[in-house]
């Protein structure tokens, strides 16, 4: 079941979401005028930025994967578990050739903050357990 959310994804009306575990609030919006275009995330007073194309790219990757995939959340300074959304979000083999995160030192946690946006857009099914959540394309 999709987590409740509100907002339209603009700076004036951001998506108000929760992390997959439901333990943290996140506010996200699209900033297409940024260079490069960004998906902006605010959580616990911290701003993170990801390539805006992450929404479409992640959805396409999950569709091609065809099954559930672990999120595998990890900070930038920690290695990501192979075969997870987090590992894909920093892989040299993804469409951007590396990190989707744009702010050095805050490029991790892709698997924690980007999938809830895809869920809000109706693109994925996302688990909401205390730990070890997974995602799959719809």
Model segments located where?
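Generic alpha-helical scaffold signal
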Residues: 49-52, 108, 112
């Amino acid at each position: 079941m999709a987590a409740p959310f509100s907002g339209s994804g603009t700076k004036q009306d951001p998506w108000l979401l929760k992390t997959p575990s439901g333990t943290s609030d996140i506010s996200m919006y699209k900033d297409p005028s940024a260079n490069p275009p960004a998906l902006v995330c605010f959580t616990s007073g911290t701003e993170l930025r990801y390539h805006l194309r992450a929404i479409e790219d992640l959805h396409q990757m999950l569709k091609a994967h065809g099954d559930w995939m672990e999120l595998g959340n990890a900070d930038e300074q920690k290695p990501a578990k192979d075969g997870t959304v987090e590992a894909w979000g920093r892989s040299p083999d993804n469409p951007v050739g590396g990190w989707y995160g744009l702010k050095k030192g805050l490029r991790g946690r892709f698997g924690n903050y980007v999938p809830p946006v895809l869920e809000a857009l109706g693109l994925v099914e996302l688990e909401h357990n205390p730990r070890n959540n997974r995602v799959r394309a719809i």
